Design a protein with these regions (language model features):
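N-terminal lobe/hinge region of extracytoplasmic solute-binding protein
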Residues: 3-54, 85, 147
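Gly/Pro-rich hinge or "lid" segments in bacterial periplasmic/extracellular proteins
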Residues: 37, 123-180, 185-191, 295-300
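Aromatic- and charge-enriched surface segment that lines or borders ligand/interaction sites
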Residues: 48-93, 241
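Surface-exposed binding/hinge segments that line
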Residues: 51, 96-140, 156-158
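Bilobed periplasmic-binding protein-like "clamshell/Venus-flytrap" ligand-binding domains
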Residues: 125-130, 307-336, 426-461
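Ligand-site clamp/hinge motif
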Residues: 168-214, 360-362
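Append "and occasionally in soluble cytosolic enzymes with long acidic Gly/Pro-rich linkers
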Residues: 243-351, 437
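Detector for C-terminal structural segments
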Residues: 254-285, 342-351, 375-485
Length: 485
């Protein structure tokens, strides 16, 4: 018996999920052409193999034969094409969970029943990550609870109350090891935790900071999982004094991100110093000296750039172009999530810590929509915010000059060129090489500060998986093949 949080999911549609917990439900009901393994590398799933043309812009995927959807109909290339085109058509209006597919695929077609041909926007290794979207039958794209090829089917769903999963009678691997999954649905994170503590629930998914108290309990196992939510301290390069690299570097040296993770997030994070996932093939761990907490170095950097406490009021000043002293002052915008006030606590810590070293920081709590507006027009100094990172390891949208997520107004010809170069790579080693160059440029330029990826916890009374890399969208991965001794 599983318990999840949900208030918005009224129908089951894997192409348009509206709540994160349902992604894990869908992950054991539906499959993509490709999947991502424990090393965060793409591998074939419904596809048996694939090939790419010499110019890198035509990809050919061969489907496994004799696969069926849960309604007994055969999986054909036409189903893959119909699913992709459904996503691409919605993406024309910037809608749909998988809308980023439009940046990878220019067209898709079927050659016979078992061959899918994808014309790519560019020669780019990242396309393989984009081909992980769930495949549905062509006739069921807008159906509630459509057939899939995964290990389970939903045999009953009562929105806001419960759903029940049973084995897919046509699953290619036979009968899954766990043959019944009952899912209770609760409206709040607190209700989910209560269900685990008092109602005999076997497992829950939670991102609540309060769940840390259950870790290490004699009757519970805790599986930490990584979300795609990258928490950052954004710094506006178009606003004084953050247009000065010295000030940005000093902030990076003073703010103790490890303390934030430990004291305010209860360790429910996966630390990273760059926009990429640490501990994986994509992460350059040789850059740690750039990100070391060192207030002494911070003060040295500021002093070398002319910042002094001239009037001894505890706030640093510097001469501007007019020969006038200006203070080292800035605002810090923050918005809160409904379930906790951890960001506000973090903002207050940053204010107090920077204040001890001559910064004058004013924290302003705002509505999410107001922060969005401030970021879009550049009316801020500092902002605690998060990015929902795509499944493809490519941070160009927030690093390239004038790109959509570059709220910091960071301008670097070198970085933009590197991001463009990344999108020309066709092999994993070459892709990794350019990713490392991007991270070194990020470390040198200090455009903003990456804190960590938020994490959550699966609390369970019984182990059900051997997966090493537990990700938020696939929290039930492995339950279909797990064997108990």
């Amino acid at each position: 018996m599983l318990c999840i949080q949900s208030t918005k999911t009224l129908t089951l549609n894997p192409l348009d999920p509206v709540e994160r917990d349902f992604l894990s439900i869908y992950s054991i009901m539906y499959d993509g052409l490709m999947s991502i393994n424990d090393d965060y590398l793409p591998e074939t799933d419904l596809a048996e193999d694939y090939s790419v043309s010499p110019n890198g812009k035509t990809w050919t995927f061969k489907l496994k034969k004799d696969l069926k959807f849960s309604d007994g109909t055969d999986l054909k290339a036409s189903d893959v094409v119909a699913t992709a085109n459904y996503i691409l058509n919605k993406a024309k209006n910037n809608s749909g969970y998988y809308l980023n597919l439009k940046y990878f695929v220019s067209s898709i077609s079927a050659e016979g029943d078992y061959t899918v041909v994808v014309k790519a926007e560019r020669a780019y290794y990242g396309l393989l990550y984009a081909m992980t979207f769930p495949i549905l039958p062509a006739h069921a794209l807008e159906m509630n609870n459509p057939p899939g090829t995964g290990a389970y089917v939903c045999e009953a769903f009562h929105p806001g109350v419960a759903l029940r999963l049973a084995p897919n009678p046509y699953w290619e691997q036979g009968v899954p090891q766990v043959t019944r999954i009952h899912v209770n649905i609760k409206p709040t994170a607190a209700d989910v935790l209560s269900a685990y503590e008092y109602s005999g629930t076997d497992a829950i998914f939670t991102r609540s900071i309060a769940s840390a108290q259950y870790k290490g309990g004699a009757s519970s196992l805790a599986l930490d999982y990584r979300t795609n939510q990258l928490e950052c301290l954004l710094m506006n390069h178009s606003a004084f004094p953050l247009n000065l690299k010295s000030v940005r570097e000093a902030i990076r040296c003073i703010v103790d991100v490890d303390k934030i993770a430990r004291s305010y997030y209860n360790g429910m994070v996966e630390r990273t110093d760059t926009p990429f996932i640490s501990g994986t093939w994509m992460y350059d761990d040789s850059l740690s000296n750039y990100f070391r907490t060192d207030p002494v170095r911070a003060m040295s950097i500021l002093e070398a750039d002319g910042w002094l406490d001239v009037d001894e009021d505890g706030v640093l000043e510097r001469l501007n172009d007019k020969g006038e002293y200006v203070e080292l002052k800035m605002n810090l915008f923050v918005y809160e999530e409904p379930d906790d006030n951890v960001r506000l606590e973090t903002a207050n810590y940053i204010r107090d810590t920077l204040g001890a070293y001559g910064f004058k920081v004013t924290v302003q709590t705002m509505k999410f929509t107001d922060v969005q507006q401030a970021l879009s027009v550049g009316n801020f100094h500092l902002c605690l915010a998060s990015y929902a990172m795509d499944v493809c390891p490519d941070a160009g949208f927030l690093l390239m000059s004038s790109n959509t997520g570059n709220y910091c107004r960071y301008r670097s010809t070198e970085m933009t060129d590197l991001c463009k170069e990344l999108r020309k790579q066709m092999t994993q080693p070459d892709y990794q090489r350019v990713l490392f160059q991007i991270q070194r440029q990020f470390a040198e330029d200090c455009p903003f500060i990456c804190f960590f990826y938020r994490s959550g916890t699966v609390l369970t009374r019984r182990m059900y998986t051997t997966v090493r890399d537990v990700r938020e969208s696939e929290l039930l991965k492995g339950i279909d093949t797990f064997r108990t001794n």
